[in-house]
Protein backbone atom coordinates (compact mmCIF):
# COMPACT_ATOMS: atom_id res chain seq x y z
CA UNK A 1 0.00 0.00 0.00
CA UNK A 2 1.44 3.36 -1.04
CA UNK A 3 1.70 6.38 1.24
CA UNK A 4 0.91 9.92 0.10
CA UNK A 5 3.52 12.65 -0.02
CA UNK A 6 3.40 16.39 -0.63
CA UNK A 7 6.05 18.69 -2.08
CA UNK A 8 5.63 22.40 -1.37
CA UNK A 9 7.76 25.22 -2.74
CA UNK A 10 8.18 28.57 -1.04
CA UNK A 11 6.47 30.28 -3.99
CA UNK A 12 3.26 28.41 -3.16
CA UNK A 13 3.53 25.62 -5.74
CA UNK A 14 2.14 22.30 -4.47
CA UNK A 15 2.76 18.80 -5.85
CA UNK A 16 1.10 15.62 -4.60
CA UNK A 17 2.70 12.23 -5.14
CA UNK A 18 3.74 8.97 -3.54
CA UNK A 19 6.22 8.53 -0.68
CA UNK A 20 9.04 6.18 -1.73
CA UNK A 21 11.52 6.74 1.09
CA UNK A 22 11.42 7.34 4.82
CA UNK A 23 8.36 8.72 6.58
CA UNK A 24 8.49 12.24 7.97
CA UNK A 25 9.58 15.60 6.64
CA UNK A 26 12.56 17.25 5.03
CA UNK A 27 13.36 20.81 4.00
CA UNK A 28 16.03 22.31 1.79
CA UNK A 29 16.78 24.12 -1.43
CA UNK A 30 15.04 22.35 -4.33
CA UNK A 31 17.29 21.97 -7.39
CA UNK A 32 17.12 19.93 -10.59
CA UNK A 33 19.75 17.59 -12.02
CA UNK A 34 19.66 16.57 -15.70
CA UNK A 35 21.89 13.48 -15.48
CA UNK A 36 20.35 10.32 -16.94
CA UNK A 37 22.38 7.97 -14.71
CA UNK A 38 24.18 8.01 -11.38
CA UNK A 39 21.31 8.64 -8.96
CA UNK A 40 23.14 6.90 -6.12
CA UNK A 41 26.28 8.94 -6.69
CA UNK A 42 24.14 12.09 -6.69
CA UNK A 43 22.36 11.18 -3.47
CA UNK A 44 25.63 10.48 -1.66
CA UNK A 45 27.50 13.54 -2.94
CA UNK A 46 28.11 15.77 0.13
CA UNK A 47 27.74 18.82 -2.13
CA UNK A 48 23.97 18.16 -2.02
CA UNK A 49 23.71 18.69 1.74
CA UNK A 50 20.59 20.75 2.54
CA UNK A 51 19.36 20.33 -1.04
CA UNK A 52 16.33 18.39 -2.29
CA UNK A 53 17.27 16.96 -5.67
CA UNK A 54 14.85 16.71 -8.59
CA UNK A 55 16.00 14.22 -11.22
CA UNK A 56 14.66 15.24 -14.63
CA UNK A 57 15.16 11.83 -16.24
CA UNK A 58 11.76 10.11 -15.85
CA UNK A 59 12.80 6.59 -14.79
CA UNK A 60 14.92 6.47 -11.65
CA UNK A 61 15.79 3.30 -9.75
CA UNK A 62 16.08 0.86 -12.66
CA UNK A 63 19.45 -0.52 -11.55
CA UNK A 64 19.01 -0.51 -7.78
CA UNK A 65 21.93 0.48 -5.55
CA UNK A 66 25.29 -0.94 -4.54
CA UNK A 67 27.78 0.20 -1.86
CA UNK A 68 30.55 0.43 -4.47
CA UNK A 69 28.79 3.33 -6.21
CA UNK A 70 28.41 5.56 -3.16
CA UNK A 71 30.40 8.81 -3.04
CA UNK A 72 30.23 8.96 0.76
CA UNK A 73 29.28 6.68 3.64
CA UNK A 74 25.73 8.02 3.74
CA UNK A 75 23.10 9.89 1.74
CA UNK A 76 23.74 13.63 1.98
CA UNK A 77 20.92 14.98 -0.20
CA UNK A 78 18.10 16.34 1.96
CA UNK A 79 15.50 14.63 -0.21
CA UNK A 80 14.73 13.16 -3.62
CA UNK A 81 12.06 13.99 -6.22
CA UNK A 82 11.43 11.73 -9.24
CA UNK A 83 8.77 11.14 -11.87
CA UNK A 84 8.54 7.36 -12.01
CA UNK A 85 9.87 4.53 -9.84
CA UNK A 86 10.24 1.22 -11.75
CA UNK A 87 8.55 -1.83 -10.26
CA UNK A 88 11.70 -3.92 -10.65
CA UNK A 89 15.38 -3.04 -10.12
CA UNK A 90 17.59 -5.15 -12.37
CA UNK A 91 21.39 -5.12 -12.42
CA UNK A 92 24.00 -7.75 -11.63
CA UNK A 93 25.68 -5.40 -9.14
CA UNK A 94 22.49 -4.35 -7.34
CA UNK A 95 22.34 -5.07 -3.62
CA UNK A 96 19.29 -3.03 -2.62
CA UNK A 97 16.34 -1.33 -4.32
CA UNK A 98 16.20 2.46 -4.36
CA UNK A 99 13.20 2.67 -1.95
CA UNK A 100 14.89 0.32 0.53
CA UNK A 101 18.12 2.31 0.24
CA UNK A 102 16.29 5.58 0.90
CA UNK A 103 14.51 4.13 3.93
CA UNK A 104 17.74 2.67 5.32
CA UNK A 105 19.33 6.12 5.10
CA UNK A 106 16.31 7.96 6.52
CA UNK A 107 15.85 9.91 3.28
CA UNK A 108 12.43 11.39 2.52
CA UNK A 109 11.49 11.12 -1.17
CA UNK A 110 8.52 11.63 -3.45
CA UNK A 111 7.60 10.06 -6.81
CA UNK A 112 4.74 10.41 -9.26
CA UNK A 113 4.83 14.17 -9.72
CA UNK A 114 5.21 16.24 -12.87
CA UNK A 115 8.95 16.84 -12.78
CA UNK A 116 8.82 18.73 -16.10
CA UNK A 117 6.51 21.33 -14.55
CA UNK A 118 8.68 21.49 -11.43
CA UNK A 119 11.86 21.91 -13.47
CA UNK A 120 10.34 24.78 -15.46
CA UNK A 121 9.44 26.54 -12.22
CA UNK A 122 13.00 26.16 -10.92
CA UNK A 123 14.52 27.20 -14.25
CA UNK A 124 12.37 30.31 -14.60
CA UNK A 125 12.13 31.41 -10.96
CA UNK A 126 15.41 30.01 -9.66
CA UNK A 127 16.03 27.38 -7.03
CA UNK A 128 13.25 27.37 -4.43
CA UNK A 129 13.22 26.50 -0.77
CA UNK A 130 10.95 23.52 -0.36
CA UNK A 131 9.58 20.78 1.86
CA UNK A 132 8.54 17.16 1.35
CA UNK A 133 6.04 15.69 3.82
CA UNK A 134 5.60 11.91 3.62
CA UNK A 135 2.78 10.12 5.39
CA UNK A 136 -0.99 10.01 5.78
CA UNK A 137 -1.05 13.08 8.04
CA UNK A 138 0.75 15.37 5.56
CA UNK A 139 -1.03 18.63 4.78
CA UNK A 140 -0.34 21.29 2.18
CA UNK A 141 -0.48 24.04 4.81
CA UNK A 142 2.18 22.42 6.98
CA UNK A 143 4.43 21.66 4.01
CA UNK A 144 4.22 25.25 2.79
CA UNK A 145 4.91 26.59 6.28
CA UNK A 146 8.07 24.49 6.59
CA UNK A 147 9.25 25.39 3.07
CA UNK A 148 8.98 29.11 3.79
CA UNK A 149 10.73 28.74 7.14
CA UNK A 150 13.90 27.28 5.59
CA UNK A 151 16.54 30.07 5.60
CA UNK A 152 18.19 29.15 2.29
CA UNK A 153 21.83 28.38 1.49
CA UNK A 154 23.08 31.95 1.16
CA UNK A 155 25.36 32.58 4.13
CA UNK A 156 25.28 28.93 5.22
CA UNK A 157 28.63 27.28 6.01
CA UNK A 158 28.04 23.58 5.39
CA UNK A 159 31.63 22.48 4.76
CA UNK A 160 32.29 22.16 8.48
CA UNK A 161 29.10 20.09 8.83
CA UNK A 162 29.97 17.44 6.22
CA UNK A 163 33.74 17.21 6.69
CA UNK A 164 35.57 14.31 8.29
CA UNK A 165 36.01 14.50 12.06
CA UNK A 166 39.62 13.27 11.95
CA UNK A 167 42.57 13.12 9.61
CA UNK A 168 42.99 9.86 7.67
CA UNK A 169 45.11 8.26 4.96
CA UNK A 170 43.59 7.14 1.64
CA UNK A 171 45.06 4.52 -0.74
CA UNK A 172 42.01 3.17 -2.62
CA UNK A 173 42.14 3.57 -6.41
CA UNK A 174 39.51 3.65 -9.16
CA UNK A 175 37.20 0.68 -9.69
CA UNK A 176 38.73 -2.33 -11.43
CA UNK A 177 36.39 -4.33 -13.66
CA UNK A 178 38.26 -7.63 -13.38
CA UNK A 179 38.36 -7.65 -9.58
CA UNK A 180 35.04 -5.80 -9.17
CA UNK A 181 36.68 -3.67 -6.48
CA UNK A 182 38.61 -0.52 -5.67
CA UNK A 183 42.17 -1.86 -5.21
CA UNK A 184 44.36 -0.57 -2.40
CA UNK A 185 47.70 0.75 -3.68
CA UNK A 186 50.81 0.27 -1.48
CA UNK A 187 52.21 3.56 -0.18
CA UNK A 188 55.57 2.77 -1.75
CA UNK A 189 53.98 2.90 -5.20
CA UNK A 190 52.57 6.40 -4.63
CA UNK A 191 55.35 8.97 -5.19
CA UNK A 192 53.42 12.19 -4.44
CA UNK A 193 52.19 13.15 -0.99
CA UNK A 194 49.05 15.27 -1.31
CA UNK A 195 47.06 16.78 1.53
CA UNK A 196 43.39 16.87 0.55
CA UNK A 197 41.05 19.22 2.38
CA UNK A 198 37.68 17.59 2.94
CA UNK A 199 35.01 20.25 2.48
CA UNK A 200 32.65 17.44 1.42
CA UNK A 201 34.94 15.41 -0.80
CA UNK A 202 33.60 12.76 -3.17
CA UNK A 203 35.36 9.42 -2.95
CA UNK A 204 35.98 9.22 -6.70
CA UNK A 205 38.12 12.35 -6.49
CA UNK A 206 40.36 10.62 -3.97
CA UNK A 207 40.47 7.47 -6.10
CA UNK A 208 41.47 9.37 -9.23
CA UNK A 209 44.29 11.10 -7.37
CA UNK A 210 45.54 7.74 -6.06
CA UNK A 211 45.34 6.28 -9.58
CA UNK A 212 47.77 9.02 -10.65
CA UNK A 213 50.30 8.26 -7.93
CA UNK A 214 49.13 10.37 -4.98
CA UNK A 215 49.50 9.23 -1.39
CA UNK A 216 46.66 11.11 0.28
CA UNK A 217 46.30 12.57 3.72
CA UNK A 218 42.71 13.80 4.05
CA UNK A 219 42.20 16.51 6.66
CA UNK A 220 39.12 18.20 8.20
CA UNK A 221 37.91 21.45 6.68
CA UNK A 222 39.03 23.57 9.64
CA UNK A 223 42.61 22.24 9.77
CA UNK A 224 45.02 25.19 10.15
CA UNK A 225 47.60 25.75 7.42
CA UNK A 226 50.42 25.24 9.91
CA UNK A 227 49.37 21.62 10.52
CA UNK A 228 49.25 20.91 6.80
CA UNK A 229 52.60 22.55 6.09
CA UNK A 230 54.14 20.47 8.89
CA UNK A 231 53.26 17.37 6.84
CA UNK A 232 55.55 18.65 4.05
CA UNK A 233 53.15 17.84 1.19
CA UNK A 234 54.06 17.87 -2.49
CA UNK A 235 50.66 19.34 -3.29
CA UNK A 236 47.46 20.61 -1.67
CA UNK A 237 44.02 19.69 -2.96
CA UNK A 238 40.86 21.70 -2.17
CA UNK A 239 37.76 19.54 -2.50
CA UNK A 240 34.17 20.04 -3.54
CA UNK A 241 31.54 20.73 -0.91
CA UNK A 242 28.13 22.24 -0.14
CA UNK A 243 26.86 25.65 0.85
CA UNK A 244 28.09 29.21 0.52
CA UNK A 245 31.88 29.64 0.28
CA UNK A 246 31.96 33.15 1.76
CA UNK A 247 31.38 32.14 5.42
CA UNK A 248 34.29 29.64 5.28
CA UNK A 249 36.80 32.11 6.77
CA UNK A 250 38.94 29.30 8.21
CA UNK A 251 39.44 27.79 4.74
CA UNK A 252 40.08 31.12 3.02
CA UNK A 253 42.76 32.03 5.57
CA UNK A 254 44.48 28.65 5.26
CA UNK A 255 44.55 28.91 1.47
CA UNK A 256 46.08 32.39 1.68
CA UNK A 257 48.91 30.92 3.74
CA UNK A 258 49.44 28.14 1.19
CA UNK A 259 49.64 30.73 -1.57
CA UNK A 260 52.59 32.29 0.26
CA UNK A 261 54.52 29.07 -0.44
CA UNK A 262 55.51 27.38 -3.70
CA UNK A 263 53.37 24.26 -3.11
CA UNK A 264 51.02 23.50 -6.05
CA UNK A 265 47.33 23.98 -5.20
CA UNK A 266 44.39 22.46 -7.11
CA UNK A 267 40.73 23.15 -6.29
CA UNK A 268 37.43 21.69 -7.46
CA UNK A 269 33.91 23.10 -7.04
CA UNK A 270 33.79 24.69 -3.56
CA UNK A 271 37.58 24.50 -3.51
CA UNK A 272 37.59 26.54 -6.74
CA UNK A 273 35.43 29.21 -5.14
CA UNK A 274 37.57 29.27 -2.00
CA UNK A 275 40.75 29.71 -4.05
CA UNK A 276 39.10 32.67 -5.78
CA UNK A 277 38.06 34.25 -2.48
CA UNK A 278 41.53 33.71 -1.01
CA UNK A 279 42.98 35.49 -4.05
CA UNK A 280 40.72 38.53 -3.73
CA UNK A 281 37.79 37.70 -6.03
CA UNK A 282 34.13 37.47 -5.01
CA UNK A 283 31.42 34.85 -5.40
CA UNK A 284 27.70 35.08 -6.10
CA UNK A 285 24.56 32.98 -5.70
CA UNK A 286 23.27 31.64 -9.02
CA UNK A 287 19.64 31.51 -10.09
CA UNK A 288 19.20 27.77 -10.44
CA UNK A 289 22.82 26.69 -10.51
CA UNK A 290 24.39 23.97 -12.61
CA UNK A 291 23.45 20.37 -11.80
CA UNK A 292 23.95 17.72 -14.45
CA UNK A 293 26.37 15.64 -16.50
CA UNK A 294 26.05 17.27 -19.92
CA UNK A 295 27.34 20.82 -19.44
CA UNK A 296 29.57 22.18 -22.24
CA UNK A 297 32.60 24.12 -21.04
CA UNK A 298 35.25 25.77 -23.19
CA UNK A 299 38.96 25.85 -22.44
CA UNK A 300 39.78 29.49 -23.18
CA UNK A 301 43.43 28.72 -24.00
CA UNK A 302 42.92 25.91 -26.52
CA UNK A 303 39.35 26.59 -27.61
CA UNK A 304 38.48 22.95 -26.94
CA UNK A 305 34.91 22.30 -25.78
CA UNK A 306 34.42 19.63 -23.12
CA UNK A 307 31.26 18.02 -21.77
CA UNK A 308 31.40 18.16 -18.00
CA UNK A 309 29.66 17.12 -14.81
CA UNK A 310 28.44 20.08 -12.75
CA UNK A 311 26.95 20.57 -9.30
CA UNK A 312 27.04 24.05 -7.83
CA UNK A 313 24.70 26.85 -6.83
CA UNK A 314 27.39 29.50 -6.30
CA UNK A 315 29.94 30.82 -8.80
CA UNK A 316 32.97 33.07 -8.96
CA UNK A 317 32.09 36.55 -10.22
CA UNK A 318 34.40 37.06 -13.19
CA UNK A 319 34.07 40.84 -13.01
CA UNK A 320 35.84 40.79 -9.63
CA UNK A 321 38.96 38.84 -10.68
CA UNK A 322 42.09 40.64 -9.47
CA UNK A 323 45.27 40.89 -11.54
CA UNK A 324 46.68 37.73 -9.96
CA UNK A 325 43.84 35.58 -11.38
CA UNK A 326 42.94 34.79 -14.96
CA UNK A 327 39.95 32.97 -16.41
CA UNK A 328 40.73 29.59 -18.00
CA UNK A 329 37.30 28.01 -18.62
CA UNK A 330 33.75 29.24 -19.28
CA UNK A 331 30.33 27.62 -19.42
CA UNK A 332 28.77 27.57 -22.88
CA UNK A 333 25.32 27.38 -21.30
CA UNK A 334 25.37 30.77 -19.58
CA UNK A 335 28.90 32.16 -19.87
CA UNK A 336 29.68 31.81 -16.17
CA UNK A 337 33.26 31.33 -15.04
CA UNK A 338 34.36 27.69 -14.83
CA UNK A 339 38.09 27.82 -14.26
CA UNK A 340 40.81 30.10 -12.93
CA UNK A 341 44.53 30.07 -12.31
CA UNK A 342 46.92 32.27 -10.41
CA UNK A 343 49.32 34.23 -12.58
CA UNK A 344 51.97 34.38 -9.85
CA UNK A 345 51.66 30.93 -8.24
CA UNK A 346 51.13 27.31 -9.25
CA UNK A 347 47.48 27.31 -8.21
CA UNK A 348 44.45 26.59 -10.38
CA UNK A 349 40.89 25.38 -10.04
CA UNK A 350 37.81 24.18 -11.89
CA UNK A 351 34.15 24.75 -11.03
CA UNK A 352 32.86 21.44 -12.39
CA UNK A 353 33.74 17.87 -11.48
CA UNK A 354 36.68 16.34 -13.41
CA UNK A 355 36.11 13.06 -11.56
CA UNK A 356 32.50 12.93 -12.87
CA UNK A 357 30.75 10.07 -11.04
CA UNK A 358 28.33 10.41 -12.67
CA UNK A 359 29.30 11.97 -15.96
CA UNK A 360 32.00 12.28 -18.62
CA UNK A 361 35.74 12.42 -17.99
CA UNK A 362 36.59 15.14 -20.53
CA UNK A 363 38.16 17.32 -17.82
CA UNK A 364 40.08 14.52 -16.07
CA UNK A 365 43.39 15.81 -17.54
CA UNK A 366 43.26 18.55 -14.90
CA UNK A 367 44.36 15.87 -12.44
CA UNK A 368 47.34 15.17 -14.71
CA UNK A 369 48.18 18.87 -14.74
CA UNK A 370 48.28 18.80 -10.94
CA UNK A 371 50.63 15.81 -11.04
CA UNK A 372 52.88 17.57 -13.55
CA UNK A 373 53.02 20.67 -11.34
CA UNK A 374 54.20 18.59 -8.39
CA UNK A 375 56.77 16.76 -10.54
CA UNK A 376 58.21 20.04 -11.85
CA UNK A 377 58.61 21.40 -8.32
CA UNK A 378 60.77 18.46 -7.23
From Swiss-Prot:
Biological or metabolic pathway of the protein: Amino-acid biosynthesis; L-arginine biosynthesis; carbamoyl phosphate from bicarbonate: step 1/1; Pyrimidine metabolism; UMP biosynthesis via de novo pathway; (S)-dihydroorotate from bicarbonate: step 1/3
Active site: 269 (nucleophile), 353, 355
Annotated region (CPSase), positions in chain: 1-189
Glutamine amidotransferase type-1 domain sequence ranges: 193-378
Alphabetically ordered keywords of this record: Amino-acid biosynthesis, Arginine biosynthesis, ATP-binding, Glutamine amidotransferase, Ligase, Nucleotide-binding, Pyrimidine biosynthesis
The protein's Enzyme Commission number: 6.3.5.5
The keyword Translocase belongs to this UniProt entry's keyword annotation: no
Any one GO BP annotation for this protein: L-arginine biosynthetic process
Top-level EC class: ligase
Top-level taxon of origin: Bacteria
SMART domains per the UniProt record, alphabetical: CPSase_sm_chain (SM01097)
PROSITE patterns: GATASE_TYPE_1 (PS51273)
Main function: Small subunit of the glutamine-dependent carbamoyl phosphate synthetase (CPSase). CPSase catalyzes the formation of carbamoyl phosphate from the ammonia moiety of glutamine, carbonate, and phosphate donated by ATP, constituting the first step of 2 biosynthetic pathways, one leading to arginine and/or urea and the other to pyrimidine nucleotides. The small subunit (glutamine amidotransferase) binds and cleaves glutamine to supply the large subunit with the substrate ammonia.
Subunit architecture: Composed of two chains; the small (or glutamine) chain promotes the hydrolysis of glutamine to ammonia, which is used by the large (or ammonia) chain to synthesize carbamoyl phosphate. Tetramer of heterodimers (alpha,beta)4.
HAMAP family to which the protein is assigned, alphabetical: CPSase_S_chain
Protein name: Carbamoyl phosphate synthase small chain
Gene name of this polypeptide: carA
